[in-house]
A protein has these predicted regions:
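Basic, polyanion-binding surface patches
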Residues: 1-164
């Protein structure tokens, strides 16, 4: 018998994750669609693949799983407000957010992010109430800084144990 939903949510809160914004251009309108995630991972070195998961019932779901390309911006510790902005439902976001455009693939990227990754959508897998989106990395750059992390429903940063 599967575990309860409450216990499963507690497990998720017990796991720290790097915070990223994944974004694309909507096919019909060319509007930028993006969301905050902590499910981004590198998947393969040969070929260079990355992946993230997205819930089926989010407003960004359809454009994100049908896009041909997407950008991933790993946020730095000073970009908490950007993470909060893209964690809100699309209809509640209000203000326009500035973006860089990918140098190789036309994808939206967050300026001054810890890293920016330009991807072509490789595969989309359905699993439970999520889709797993796999991207082929066409270009990437690291810009330096400290990562923004998410743990226990809070944003924070990394502190090495040796520094305590």
């Amino acid at each position: 018998m599967p575990i309860s939903g409450d216990l499963y949510r507690q497990l998720g809160r017990a796991s720290a994750g790097a915070v990223s914004v994944v974004a694309t251009y909507e096919a019909d309108t060319d509007a930028i669609v993006g969301l905050t995630i902590s499910s981004f991972v590198t998947l393969s070195f040969e070929p260079p693949l990355v992946m993230y998961a997205i819930q089926r019932h989010t407003a960004s779901y359809a454009p994100m799983v049908t896009c041909r390309s997407f950008g991933v911006s790993l946020l730095n510790a000073a970009q908490t407000e950007i993470a909060r902005h893209f964690a809100k439902p699309r209809r509640e976001r209000g203000t326009h957010m500035p973006f860089d455009t990918g140098q190789v693939v036309r994808v939206p990227l967050i300026p001054q992010a810890l890293a920016q990754i330009e991807c072509l959508t490789q595969e989309v897998f359905m699993s439970g109430d999520h889709a797993i989106v796999v991207g082929l990395v066409e270009a990437a750059r690291t810009l330096g800084g400290e990562p923004l992390l998410y743990f226990g429903r809070q944003y924070g940063n990394f502190s090495p144990l040796a520094d305590r």
